[in-house]
């Protein structure tokens, strides 16, 4: 649709891996599947968190539904890498299944919003830093253009004269 692939948003992919790893741990704690499967899933998730396998997330960022495509993409990438880490071939889902194991005890309506919330919670620190940099840039432009007089505008009409610097400082 947009031509923009999910792989261009590594923080979203990493958050998905964190959610899948936490769910796998909970499933083992509840006896849903074995520690061997958990080890494979954790290994795959750690690789994703470390920035690997992101090239396998080629879905468009805009998609129908409530994130089902993204959730299943994550499940399949994690399951296939987990299989390799466990000594099996990709697609040998009897050992680690994308739906039954990686997505075990979850739905898209659990995993997708949780991963997006996690991404926002983890990303806010960087956002604050970038906002502070933007504020500093506006202040610098405000000083640079403080002597350039221009007509102010309000309600699509001319208003009180102001400097271009004052306009930048308003941001």
Regions found by a protein language model. Give the residues of each.
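Conserved, well-structured ligand/cofactor-binding cores
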Residues: 1-171
